Amino acid sequence: MDMKTSPLATLADAALLKTDALIDGVWVGAATRFAVTDPATGQALAQVANLGDAEAEAAIAAADRAWPAWRAKTAKERGAILMQWFRLLQQHADDLARIMTAEQ
């Protein structure tokens, strides 16, 4: 993939394009990867981790471990976290839209 000619080359924050999975706070790759392509052009946009059963199990276990701490938060604390996430989505809306539409 040549990022100079990719539709994703215009991202204001290239760090938003992740090709691994976030599991338990750690970016996890895989032994194999597969291409995500722009269906309009056939151009490869990125090579992403081809995760399997072990990674799925790790993600489920991490979510299970995180649940008690989330459950213990007050509605106000949860709301503040969700509002922070919403603000980040708004802040990066243009780049996120480019990433999402490039692979559609």
Label each region the model flagged.
Residues 1-47, 80, 84:
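Terminal low-complexity tails and localization/encapsulation signals of metabolic enzymes
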Residues 45-104:
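Glycine-rich loop-to-alpha-helix module at the N-terminal edge of alpha/beta enzyme cores
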